[in-house]
Amino acid sequence: MAKIKIFTDSCSDLSTEVRKQYDIEYVHMGIVVDGEEKRADLDWVDYKPEEFYGWLKEGRHVKTTQVSVPEFMDNFRPALKEGYDIIYIACSSKLSGSVSTCETLVKPQLLEEFPDRKIYAIDSLNASASEGLIAIEAAKLRAAGKSVDQVANWVEENKLCFNFFATVDTLTYLKNAGRIKGAKAFFGNIMGVKPIFISDALGNNFVIKKAKGTKNSLEELINGLKEAYMQEKGAEVFIGQGLAQDRAETIKERLKAELNIEAKITWIGPIVGTTCGPGVIAVYCLGKEVTRFEGDGK
């Protein structure tokens, strides 16, 4: 196996078990809770997911921060010293400045120190477990003996084939994060509107349709995955949830019965969870290429 370290970040929502299975590492983003800085921890060591989502439900002020330069250095430098090349699969540049920080502030300095090594900082144009799925597929290619250039090129050529469909329980947290206007959130909550989000071909998250009520929103998620999923590509399917385990189980049962898919349920972590709030749920797969653009009316 080639000496390649595959990194992603806190936005990828890959569990401890999955990261160990595929030998994937990650760099930490951060959250700030009522002024107190904390790591955006996918292992849930410093706080449990129920505690995190409880903070949001209590109305505590939570915001997110991107990966810092020291965090990159502390993780990348030891790998380079050991002779590894690095592929960093990053959260969409439309949602985080982490990939830009890596490309402009971290990579040049480290390549001066380690001129024989290679570092790829790849904008996944995605987030949450669809970003994580890209890292998994990269790890499979590494295990198959592909070179760092081959793995990185495959990711660049195929990253738009990773799809997600997501919905939220309330529009309040999207409003707090500045994603929608206050009036839309107010009237949407009153009407029971559940927006269905995807990531477009430029890495923007946008609403493709609106469902009335929880049952209809779950149906839209399932239908979206059915349309996008391509079983012949042989990738995992994930269901992400933030205090929505019962709905995640419902989707899992439907996917097993209707598509014979054994989907894995995972927590939606602190980065996406802060923006979307308790009750967020999403499905993720490798499938058809994303060709939509925000505002294209399709």
Question: Which residue ranges define each predicted feature?
Answer:
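Short catalytic-loop micro-motif centered on adjacent basic/acidic residues
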Residues: 6, 63, 88, 121, ...
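Acidic/glycine-enriched edge-of-secondary-structure segments
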Residues: 53-69, 201-216
